[in-house]
Amino acid sequence: MQEILIPLKEKSYKVFLGELPEIKLKQKALIISDSIVAGLHLPYLLERLNALEVRVCVIESGEKYKNFHSLERILNNAFEMQLNRHSLMIALGGGVISDMVGFASSIYFRGIDFINIPTTLLAQVDASVGGKTGINTPYGKNLIGSFHQPKAVYMDLAFLKTLEKREFQAGVAEIIKMAVCFDKNLVERLETKDLKDCLEEVIFQSVNIKAQVVVQDEKERNIRAGLNYGHTFGMLIENETNYERFLHGEAIAIGMRMANDLALSLGMLTLKEYERIENLLKKFDLIFNYQITDIQKFYERLFLDKKSENQTLKFILPKGVGAFEIASHIPKETILKVLEKWH
């Protein structure tokens, strides 16, 4: 089993990559999963979990259920089970479950521990590590949330065998995001290797990238913003399509292409670099059609992005391959010209 230590000032924890070990707990544990994952993987977890008392809360599967109602269900289960400050929650699922359980545990009794057991590629390489938690609102994605680090993260590649191809590819989008912004060697590996032959190494490399970024910038003051490449556009697209048309990684792939259009127009990417990223997305079937129906409305809604300050939009844009820049004060006309390409 491989381990990655994430040494933060207030709370350090480990990410374990390998077969799920026996988890022995001296306290009560509330497991939260979704309706699909629970049927596939809950028995596997229960075989390996030894706790004072265990209860399971199952939420409907899908991004549209990452809301106040589901959060309330989790908290009600915690109260009914009489969890205390020494108890913990366990997130068994993808990014939706990881985000919600992290948030629920951060506000229950002003904060209790939780363990992440991510079952999708996207959650393993991104959502389960770093402490970002939250729920969606009609106004946008993850607009209500907190920073709350897990007690531990357990990644078992066996979970990925049950993923549909579409779900798997959505996770690859997040790997590409990190590679383009932080590691050109990972870009080269994705370009030249068959991912099936090096999946564990790529996951380990991706988690290492995120771990190093989080250690440097836990609360996203500067370098961690690079992990939001594609998200300014992508998360708005998710909201505009009611979280039904695209998976998160698919929307982020569209968002990365929009960001690349903007970077190209600003001279931050050469045409060769632009085409290189485009071809990498094509290799993993991450090219999707999307049409903006109302350009002005879409532009105005960009200001709900959490990175915006003083009515100034900020975009994470690739600066070549393997680096990024936080770009602001971009002329409105330049942004609108990019949006027109998608109209």
From Swiss-Prot:
Its cofactor is NAD(+); Co(2+); Zn(2+). The keyword Zinc applies. Transmembrane segments: none annotated. Pfam families: DHQ_synthase, DHQS_C. It is found in: Cytoplasm. Binds 1 divalent metal cation per subunit. Can use either Co(2+) or Zn(2+). InterPro entries: Dehydroquinate_synthase, DHQ_synth_AroB, DHQ_synth_fam, DHQS/DOIS_N, DHQS_C. NAD(+) binds at residues 61-66, 95-99, 119-120, 132, 141, 159-162. It catalyses: 7-phospho-2-dehydro-3-deoxy-D-arabino-heptonate = 3-dehydroquinate + phosphate. Zn(2+) binds at E174, H231, H248. It is an enzyme of class 4 (lyase). This is 3-dehydroquinate synthase. The gene is aroB.
